[in-house]
A protein has these predicted regions:
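Aromatic-rich carbohydrate-recognition surfaces in CAZymes
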Residues: 169-297, 310
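Surface-exposed patches in mature extracellular/periplasmic domains of secreted proteins
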Residues: 119-122, 147, 195, 303-310
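Conserved active-site and cofactor/substrate-binding residues in soluble primary-metabolism enzymes
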Residues: 36-41, 45, 49, 60, ...
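Secretory-pathway/luminal and periplasmic proteins that interact with or process carbohydrate-rich
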Residues: 139-145, 204-210, 259-260, 317-319
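Short alpha-helical scaffolding segments that buttress acidic/His motifs in well-ordered protein cores
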Residues: 130-137, 199, 251, 313
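Beta-sandwich/jelly-roll carbohydrate-recognition scaffolds of carbohydrate-active enzymes
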Residues: 1-168
Length: 319
């Protein structure tokens, strides 16, 4: 077990690793990288007890099992909150260390998930292509709230979701606002409501809607502020399981926070190319997001806001 291993070159601030039961290893790691202060807690259950555990500080471990042990089944629970929650998650999802039982449940869950769109006709290859693409639409976002509802917020405090609601992260919004998010309004409205409530929680903890959130932080990656188009699309389609007044407030405030040349955009209707990179792309995407705000404000009867943002949306003509 090696807590020093990283996929990217993140800075590791803190590691903890300990034996917590005859067949359990648990710990945590805090890193600085694409997002700051990323916490991962884990609890790993093994189907066989350890014969020996050599801990190399708080960072690595060498596990030894009895000579007759040939097969191990391991269940690893994860949490952004605590080892206790990680263990709770693992026991809730994998109560028994039975690989075949877990596999059967996973097959059933994937069949249900992929069954929200049913197609008929076409060749086997075309069906394979379609359902492979459908599978890819299910890989994100990531569920961040634990089975008890707790999750780590962007301000690093721990909160709890109300019963029946879930907190999500990993919103690659610049990549998804055009197609993936509108698709979800057709096939999974419960997820759409959970995502928007999660966005509003991020707004509460940071003062701004997310741009590209990951785990318990914001990467600030890519351009635009496309959370507003996701919210407006849902609202205009009648998906409204969140505080719409608060959502509109968050959209307006986020549109006026300076990022990647948006101060020039707000002041003069475009971003000069000799001052900021990606000036045309940023101008076009800010104008689109302003149009989304205008449409939602209009639907809510906020004509004052509609007029201002309909005017801002016309900035696309400047490039």
């Amino acid at each position: 077990v090696d807590l020093l291993h990283t996929v990217t070159e993140e800075k590791i601030d803190l590691c903890e690793l300990r034996r917590t039961a005859p067949g359990e290893l648990a710990g945590m790691r805090r890193t600085q990288g694409w997002v700051p202060d990323q916490y991962v807690f884990f609890a790993a259950r093994f189907s066989e007890p350890f014969a020996d555990v050599q801990l190399l500080g708080d960072k690595q471990a060498v596990l030894t099992f009895a000579p007759d042990v040939r097969t191990l089944t391991i269940a690893v629970g994860l949490s952004s909150v605590s080892v206790e929650n990680a263990r709770m998650n693992s026991l809730a999802e994998v109560p028994e260390l039975d690989f075949d039982a877990v596999h059967a449940r996973a097959v059933g869950q994937w069949r249900k998930a992929l069954g929200d769109i049913v197609v008929e006709g076409g060749s086997r290859d075309e069906m394979t292509n379609f359902y492979t693409a459908q599978y890819h639409t299910k890989l994100t976002p990531n569920l961040m709230s634990d089975v008890n509802g707790e999750y780590r917020r962007h301000d690093q405090t721990v909160a709890r979701m109300p019963e029946g609601e879930s907190y999500y992260s990993t919103f690659s919004l610049w990549d998804t606002f055009r197609a993936w998010n509108p698709l979800q309004t057709l096939v999974d409205t419960a997820l759409v409501n959970d995502m928007i409530r999660s966005m509003l929680d991020m707004y509460d903890s940071t003062g701004e809607l997310p741009i590209w959130p990951l785990a318990s932080g914001e990467t600030g990656t890519m351009i635009g502020y496309h959370a507003v188009s996701v919210i407006a699309d849902a609202y205009l389609k009648g998906i409204r399981g969140y505080d719409a007044d608060k959502a509109l407030e968050a959209m307006i405030r986020s549109s006026n926070i300076n990022k990647k040349g948006s101060d020039y955009y707000t002041a003069q209707g475009y971003i000069p190319s000799n001052i900021k990179r990606e000036s045309v792309s940023c101008t076009l995407e800010y104008a689109y997001d302003d149009w989304a705000i205008a449409r939602m404000a209009q639907a809510m009867g906020r004509d004052d806001i509609f007029g201002e943002y309909a005017r801002r949306a016309l900035n696309y003509v400047n490039v």
